[in-house]
Protein backbone atom coordinates (compact mmCIF):
# COMPACT_ATOMS: atom_id res chain seq x y z
CA UNK A 1 0.00 0.00 0.00
CA UNK A 2 1.27 3.46 -0.96
CA UNK A 3 -0.23 6.59 0.59
CA UNK A 4 0.83 10.09 -0.40
CA UNK A 5 0.87 13.26 1.69
CA UNK A 6 0.62 16.51 -0.29
CA UNK A 7 3.86 18.19 0.68
CA UNK A 8 3.55 21.91 0.01
CA UNK A 9 2.72 23.14 3.51
CA UNK A 10 1.20 22.18 6.85
CA UNK A 11 1.61 19.14 9.07
CA UNK A 12 3.22 17.00 6.38
CA UNK A 13 5.67 15.11 8.56
CA UNK A 14 3.13 14.65 11.35
CA UNK A 15 0.89 12.82 8.87
CA UNK A 16 3.83 10.77 7.59
CA UNK A 17 4.57 9.70 11.17
CA UNK A 18 0.92 8.84 11.91
CA UNK A 19 0.57 6.82 8.71
CA UNK A 20 3.74 4.84 9.46
CA UNK A 21 2.52 4.24 13.01
CA UNK A 22 -0.87 3.12 11.65
CA UNK A 23 0.75 0.74 9.17
CA UNK A 24 2.72 -0.79 12.05
CA UNK A 25 -0.35 -1.14 14.27
CA UNK A 26 -2.37 -2.72 11.45
CA UNK A 27 0.45 -5.02 10.34
CA UNK A 28 0.48 -3.52 6.84
CA UNK A 29 3.60 -3.30 4.71
CA UNK A 30 2.97 0.27 3.60
CA UNK A 31 4.93 3.14 2.13
CA UNK A 32 4.36 6.87 2.64
CA UNK A 33 5.37 9.36 -0.05
CA UNK A 34 5.54 13.16 0.11
CA UNK A 35 3.89 14.45 -3.07
CA UNK A 36 5.05 17.67 -4.75
CA UNK A 37 5.06 16.68 -8.44
CA UNK A 38 2.33 15.35 -10.76
CA UNK A 39 4.22 12.13 -11.52
CA UNK A 40 4.23 11.28 -7.80
CA UNK A 41 0.43 10.93 -7.92
CA UNK A 42 0.62 7.77 -10.00
CA UNK A 43 0.29 4.37 -8.30
CA UNK A 44 -1.02 5.80 -5.02
CA UNK A 45 -3.68 3.97 -3.02
CA UNK A 46 -4.69 7.12 -1.15
CA UNK A 47 -3.58 10.67 -0.37
CA UNK A 48 -3.81 13.10 2.55
CA UNK A 49 -4.10 16.86 2.04
CA UNK A 50 -2.78 18.33 5.30
CA UNK A 51 -3.71 21.49 7.13
CA UNK A 52 -1.87 24.76 6.62
CA UNK A 53 -3.00 27.77 4.61
CA UNK A 54 -5.48 26.62 1.97
CA UNK A 55 -4.84 29.50 -0.43
CA UNK A 56 -1.07 28.88 -0.38
CA UNK A 57 -1.44 25.12 -0.82
CA UNK A 58 -3.91 25.60 -3.68
CA UNK A 59 -1.71 28.11 -5.52
CA UNK A 60 1.42 25.94 -5.17
CA UNK A 61 -0.51 22.85 -6.29
CA UNK A 62 -1.73 24.72 -9.35
CA UNK A 63 1.71 26.15 -10.22
CA UNK A 64 3.29 22.70 -10.08
CA UNK A 65 0.46 21.17 -12.18
CA UNK A 66 -0.50 18.91 -9.29
CA UNK A 67 -3.96 20.43 -8.76
CA UNK A 68 -5.61 19.32 -12.01
CA UNK A 69 -4.20 15.79 -11.98
CA UNK A 70 -5.09 15.36 -8.31
CA UNK A 71 -8.65 16.46 -9.09
CA UNK A 72 -8.83 13.88 -11.90
CA UNK A 73 -7.47 11.11 -9.67
CA UNK A 74 -9.96 11.85 -6.88
CA UNK A 75 -12.89 11.97 -9.33
CA UNK A 76 -11.70 8.60 -10.68
CA UNK A 77 -11.85 7.19 -7.13
CA UNK A 78 -8.50 7.89 -5.41
CA UNK A 79 -9.20 7.90 -1.64
CA UNK A 80 -8.44 11.28 -0.07
CA UNK A 81 -8.44 12.71 3.44
CA UNK A 82 -8.55 16.50 3.62
CA UNK A 83 -7.57 18.00 6.97
CA UNK A 84 -8.53 21.61 7.81
CA UNK A 85 -7.09 23.42 4.76
CA UNK A 86 -7.38 20.10 2.94
CA UNK A 87 -11.11 19.98 3.68
CA UNK A 88 -11.43 23.50 2.25
CA UNK A 89 -9.70 22.34 -0.93
CA UNK A 90 -12.08 19.38 -1.30
CA UNK A 91 -15.22 21.51 -0.95
CA UNK A 92 -17.35 22.59 -3.89
CA UNK A 93 -18.32 25.81 -2.08
CA UNK A 94 -16.09 27.96 0.16
CA UNK A 95 -16.70 31.21 2.01
CA UNK A 96 -14.58 33.01 4.61
CA UNK A 97 -16.16 33.91 7.94
CA UNK A 98 -14.68 37.43 7.62
CA UNK A 99 -14.27 38.30 3.92
CA UNK A 100 -17.09 36.24 2.42
CA UNK A 101 -16.71 34.36 -0.86
CA UNK A 102 -13.17 33.33 -1.80
CA UNK A 103 -11.67 32.93 -5.28
CA UNK A 104 -8.84 30.52 -4.47
CA UNK A 105 -8.36 27.60 -6.88
CA UNK A 106 -10.04 24.55 -5.38
CA UNK A 107 -10.26 20.86 -6.13
CA UNK A 108 -14.03 21.16 -5.77
CA UNK A 109 -14.67 17.41 -5.68
CA UNK A 110 -16.81 16.94 -2.57
CA UNK A 111 -20.47 17.81 -2.06
CA UNK A 112 -19.88 20.12 0.90
CA UNK A 113 -19.87 23.85 1.59
CA UNK A 114 -17.15 25.02 3.97
CA UNK A 115 -16.73 28.26 5.90
CA UNK A 116 -13.09 29.16 6.52
CA UNK A 117 -12.05 30.39 9.98
CA UNK A 118 -15.51 29.46 11.25
CA UNK A 119 -14.36 29.37 14.87
CA UNK A 120 -12.19 32.49 14.66
CA UNK A 121 -8.49 33.15 14.11
CA UNK A 122 -5.43 31.69 15.87
CA UNK A 123 -6.37 32.89 19.37
CA UNK A 124 -9.59 30.91 19.18
CA UNK A 125 -7.98 27.55 18.60
CA UNK A 126 -9.23 24.87 20.97
CA UNK A 127 -9.40 21.15 21.76
CA UNK A 128 -12.51 19.09 22.25
CA UNK A 129 -13.46 15.45 22.78
CA UNK A 130 -15.81 14.29 20.03
CA UNK A 131 -17.39 10.97 19.13
CA UNK A 132 -17.15 10.11 15.44
CA UNK A 133 -19.65 7.87 13.68
CA UNK A 134 -18.01 4.85 12.01
CA UNK A 135 -15.07 4.99 14.45
CA UNK A 136 -16.10 3.68 17.88
CA UNK A 137 -17.70 5.02 21.05
CA UNK A 138 -14.44 6.27 22.54
CA UNK A 139 -14.08 10.08 22.27
CA UNK A 140 -11.38 11.46 19.97
CA UNK A 141 -9.40 14.47 21.18
CA UNK A 142 -9.87 16.89 18.28
CA UNK A 143 -7.48 19.84 17.85
CA UNK A 144 -9.01 22.84 16.05
CA UNK A 145 -6.64 25.55 14.71
CA UNK A 146 -8.24 28.39 12.71
CA UNK A 147 -10.59 25.64 11.68
CA UNK A 148 -13.26 25.63 9.01
CA UNK A 149 -16.73 24.17 9.49
CA UNK A 150 -18.80 22.12 7.08
CA UNK A 151 -21.87 24.33 6.86
CA UNK A 152 -23.76 22.39 4.18
CA UNK A 153 -23.67 18.94 2.63
CA UNK A 154 -25.68 17.19 -0.07
CA UNK A 155 -25.69 14.21 -2.41
CA UNK A 156 -23.90 11.16 -1.02
CA UNK A 157 -22.07 13.12 1.70
CA UNK A 158 -22.88 12.22 5.28
CA UNK A 159 -21.72 13.93 8.48
CA UNK A 160 -19.72 11.66 10.77
CA UNK A 161 -18.65 14.23 13.38
CA UNK A 162 -20.81 16.96 14.95
CA UNK A 163 -20.00 19.29 17.84
CA UNK A 164 -22.03 21.83 19.81
CA UNK A 165 -20.58 25.33 19.37
CA UNK A 166 -22.26 28.48 20.71
CA UNK A 167 -25.51 26.57 21.02
CA UNK A 168 -25.45 25.26 17.45
CA UNK A 169 -24.69 21.84 16.01
CA UNK A 170 -21.68 22.16 13.69
CA UNK A 171 -20.41 19.45 11.32
CA UNK A 172 -16.63 18.98 11.65
CA UNK A 173 -16.18 15.65 9.83
CA UNK A 174 -17.91 14.27 6.75
CA UNK A 175 -17.49 11.43 4.28
CA UNK A 176 -18.56 11.05 0.67
CA UNK A 177 -17.54 7.63 -0.68
CA UNK A 178 -13.74 7.89 -1.22
CA UNK A 179 -13.48 11.37 0.34
CA UNK A 180 -13.04 12.26 4.02
CA UNK A 181 -13.09 15.91 5.18
CA UNK A 182 -12.02 16.94 8.70
CA UNK A 183 -12.10 20.41 10.29
CA UNK A 184 -9.62 19.35 12.97
CA UNK A 185 -6.07 17.96 13.07
CA UNK A 186 -5.88 14.22 13.93
CA UNK A 187 -2.12 14.27 13.27
CA UNK A 188 -1.54 16.49 16.33
CA UNK A 189 -2.57 13.74 18.73
CA UNK A 190 -1.06 10.34 19.50
CA UNK A 191 -4.37 8.68 18.53
CA UNK A 192 -4.09 6.87 15.19
CA UNK A 193 -7.75 5.84 14.94
CA UNK A 194 -8.66 8.30 12.18
CA UNK A 195 -5.61 7.43 10.09
CA UNK A 196 -6.40 3.74 10.61
CA UNK A 197 -10.02 4.38 9.64
CA UNK A 198 -8.83 6.05 6.42
CA UNK A 199 -6.63 3.04 5.64
CA UNK A 200 -9.11 0.32 6.60
CA UNK A 201 -12.53 1.71 5.70
CA UNK A 202 -11.82 4.05 2.79
CA UNK A 203 -8.72 2.68 1.04
CA UNK A 204 -9.21 -1.05 1.68
CA UNK A 205 -13.02 -1.06 1.37
UniProtKB/Swiss-Prot annotation:
UniProt keyword annotations, A-Z:
Glutamine amidotransferase, Hydrolase, Lyase, Pyridoxal phosphate
Pathway assignment: Cofactor biosynthesis; pyridoxal 5'-phosphate biosynthesis
Q: Which residues form the active site?
A: 84, 185, 187
> One biological process GO term for this chain?
pyridoxine metabolic process
Please provide, in alphabetical order, the Gene Ontology terms of the cellular component aspect for this entry.
cytosol; glutaminase complex
* EC id: 4.3.3.6, 3.5.1.2
Q: Which GO terms describe its molecular function?
A: glutaminase activity; pyridoxal 5'-phosphate synthase (glutamine hydrolysing) activity
Keyword Repressor set for record: no
Which chemical reaction does it catalyze?
aldehydo-D-ribose 5-phosphate + D-glyceraldehyde 3-phosphate + L-glutamine = pyridoxal 5'-phosphate + L-glutamate + phosphate + 3 H2O + H(+); L-glutamine + H2O = L-glutamate + NH4(+)
Give binding positions for L-glutamine: 52-54, 116, 145-146
Pfam families assigned: SNO (PF01174)
The family database entries (InterPro entries) matched by this protein are listed as: Class_I_gatase-like, PdxT/SNO, PdxT/SNO_CS
What the record says about family reads: Belongs to the glutaminase PdxT/SNO family.
> Which HAMAP family does this entry report, sorted A to Z?
PdxT (MF_01615)
Subunit:
In the presence of PdxS, forms a dodecamer of heterodimers. Only shows activity in the heterodimer.
Q: What does this protein do?
A: Catalyzes the hydrolysis of glutamine to glutamate and ammonia as part of the biosynthesis of pyridoxal 5'-phosphate. The resulting ammonia molecule is channeled to the active site of PdxS.
**PANTHER family, A to Z:** PYRIDOXAL 5'-PHOSPHATE SYNTHASE SUBUNIT SNO, PYRIDOXAL 5'-PHOSPHATE SYNTHASE SUBUNIT SNO1-RELATED
Q: What is the name of this protein?
A: Pyridoxal 5'-phosphate synthase subunit PdxT
Q: What is the lineage of its organism?
A: Archaea, Thermoproteota, Thermoprotei, Desulfurococcales, Desulfurococcaceae
Amino acid sequence: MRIGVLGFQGGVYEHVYMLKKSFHELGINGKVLIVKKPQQLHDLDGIIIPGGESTTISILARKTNVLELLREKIVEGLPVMGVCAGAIMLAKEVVDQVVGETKQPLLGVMDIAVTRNYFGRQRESFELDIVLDELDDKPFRAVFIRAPAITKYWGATKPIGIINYNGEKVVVAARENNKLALSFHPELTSDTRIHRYFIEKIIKK
